[in-house]
């Protein structure tokens, strides 16, 4: 018996020697986390940037909180809001977590504490951390021009959080936000509660022209400033070849006191026929006639004259218009000259109509097979990639329909044809009804050739529009097409 006990004592002694270091480690860890937590700094997770610390951070950023006694972390708060974290990424000296995208920011609510706060059983650690608001932007300046000292101006835009300064300067700030040497600071301003407008008073000795800068904590927003009015800007035109009698819409900026809209240098739109939006970023008018040559629309407002970038009425690019350019060959379709009493109400002479009631699961219903007149290589060089070209046309959809779709094919290449197409406005991104709209599709979605010359080398003039109804119920449609053209993107 004594030998057995002696043997057991020896085994227990050896086991004790093995367990003792482990207990010591656990004891040290417990001692380490049994103290008040401390945060030393915050860094990014990239090990190569481990020495780069910061206090400003964007929402959605993964960060490492470095400190001491963090192993027992129970809760984490950012801007006084509890945030989630994965306990698998918590050690005694660090916590890895992501700043939530949906966090309420101090820019929106200055009463929040701009800090990260960690709570354990033994205390609380806090560290100043500024979660950045979205970058500010300016769309326009609303004012009565010409602006005089003491006049009220409204800067319209968004994300005007934590405004640090508003100033005028003849120079733009540097890319890093550094101010120019000479600035005219404006101290009398007020930000609205949606952070979308800043109302200010024009200072004495007002600059003739330069830049207005809104300096926020996150970054700065800059816009051109002209005492006598900013130059208008055109960003888009609803159609480059609108049907006569249809409405043309131009979007942009600074359409203030529009005094002239000129079409291709040929004729003006009467000022009384021009409608300007309340925000001066859109004008519209009815096109009274078609220009006889391609050109550009120009808009004259209080700040000067600007031309549209895209060619307006690119007559040289038209490949089919049912009035002398190209020709219809065969197909069950109709041709209409609008008379104002029924759809499409207005037209540039003759247009193609695909109308009627189509039965369900009908894969051969209405079609128009035509010969096109391809654009000359003096207008579109043969080496232009097909990916750089688009097929445009005007389309009128009387009412929304469900089921029927169109196929557009060219050069007998039906394998590459555009299938399942429903007309959509290239301007609004949706199917407009009861009016003409410009549609635009990449030419590469209709043909399989690499270059425009490869396309021409097919030696075919075919262009076809085919209507089918793969839907499970019959449908009635009334759709018109005109002015097919190939243009550069």
From Swiss-Prot:
Keywords: Carbohydrate metabolism, Cell outer membrane, Lipoprotein, Membrane, Palmitate, Repeat, Signal. Residues 1-27 form the signal peptide. It comes from the Bacteria. Gut bacteria supply the human body with energy from dietary polysaccharides through glycosidases that are absent in the human genome. Xyloglucans are a ubiquitous family of highly branched plant cell wall polysaccharides present in the vegetables we consume. Enzymes involved in xyloglucan degradation mediate the conversion of otherwise indigestible plant polysaccharides to short-chain fatty acids. Residues 57-103, 136-204, 232-304 form the IPT/TIG domain. This is IPT/TIG domain-containing protein BACOVA_02650. It comes from Bacteroides ovatus (strain ATCC 8483 / DSM 1896 / JCM 5824 / BCRC 10623 / CCUG 4943 / NCTC 11153). Gene3D superfamilies: Immunoglobulins. A lipid is attached at residue 28 (N-palmitoyl cysteine). InterPro entries: Ig-like_fold, Ig_E-set, IPT_dom, SGBP_B_XBD. It is a lipid-anchor. A lipid is attached at residue 28 (S-diacylglycerol cysteine). One of its GO terms (cellular component) is cell outer membrane.
């Amino acid at each position: 018996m004594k030998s057995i006990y002696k043997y057991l004592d020896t085994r227990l002694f050896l086991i004790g020697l093995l367990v003792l270091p482990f207990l010591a480690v656990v004891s040290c860890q417990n001692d380490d986390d049994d103290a008040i937590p401390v945060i030393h700094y915050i860094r990014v997770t990239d090990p190569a940037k481990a020495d780069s610390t910061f206090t400003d951070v964007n929402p959605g950023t993964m960060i490492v909180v470095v400190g001491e006694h963090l192993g027992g972390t129970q809760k984490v708060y950012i801007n006084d809001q509890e945030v989630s974290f994965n306990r698998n990424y918590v050690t005694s000296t660090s916590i890895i977590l992501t700043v939530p995208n949906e966090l309420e920011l101090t820019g929106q609510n200055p009463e929040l504490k701009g800090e990260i706060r960690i709570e354990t059983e033994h205390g609380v650690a806090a560290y100043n951390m500024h979660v950045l608001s979205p970058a500010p932007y300016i769309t326009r300046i609303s004012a009565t021009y010409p602006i005089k000292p003491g006049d009220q101006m409204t800067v319209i835009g968004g994300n005007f959080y934590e405004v640090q300064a508003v100033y005028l300067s003849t120079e733009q700030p540097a890319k890093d936000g550094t101010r120019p040497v000479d600035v005219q600071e404006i101290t009398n301003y007020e930000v609205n509660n949606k952070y979308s407008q800043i109302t200010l008073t024009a200072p004495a000795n007002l600059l003739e022209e330069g830049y207005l800068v809104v300096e926020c904590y996150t970054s700065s927003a800059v816009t051109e400033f002209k005492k006598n009015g900013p130059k208008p800007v055109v960003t888009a035109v609803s159609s480059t070849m609108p049907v006569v009698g249809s409405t043309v819409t131009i979007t942009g900026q600074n359409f203030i006191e529009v005094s002239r809209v000129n079409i291709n240098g040929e004729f003006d739109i009467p000022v009384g026929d021009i409608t300007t939006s309340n925000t001066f970023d859109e004008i519209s008018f009815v096109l009274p006639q078609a220009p006889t040559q391609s050109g550009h629309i120009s808009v004259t407002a209080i700040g000067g004259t600007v031309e549209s970038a895209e060619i307006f009425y690119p007559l040289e690019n038209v490949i089919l218009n049912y009035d002398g350019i190209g020709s219809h060959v065969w197909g069950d379709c109709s041709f209409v000259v609008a008379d104002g009493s029924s759809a499409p109400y207005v037209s540039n002479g003759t247009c193609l109509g695909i109308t009627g009631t189509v039965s369900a699961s009908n894969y051969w219903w209405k079609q128009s097979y035509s010969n096109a007149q391809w654009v000359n290589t003096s207008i579109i060089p043969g080496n232009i990639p097909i990916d750089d070209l688009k097929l445009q046309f005007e389309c009128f959809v009387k009412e929304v329909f469900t089921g029927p779709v169109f196929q557009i094919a060219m050069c007998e290449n039906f394998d590459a044809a555009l299938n399942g197409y429903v007309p959509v406005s290239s301007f609004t991104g949706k199917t407009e009804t009861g009016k003409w709209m410009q549609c635009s599709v990449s030419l590469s979605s209709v043909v399989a050739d690499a270059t425009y010359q490869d396309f021409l080398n097919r030696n075919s003039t075919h262009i076809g529009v085919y209507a089918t109804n793969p839907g499970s119920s019959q449908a009635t449609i009334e759709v018109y097409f005109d002015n097919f053209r190939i243009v550069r993107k």
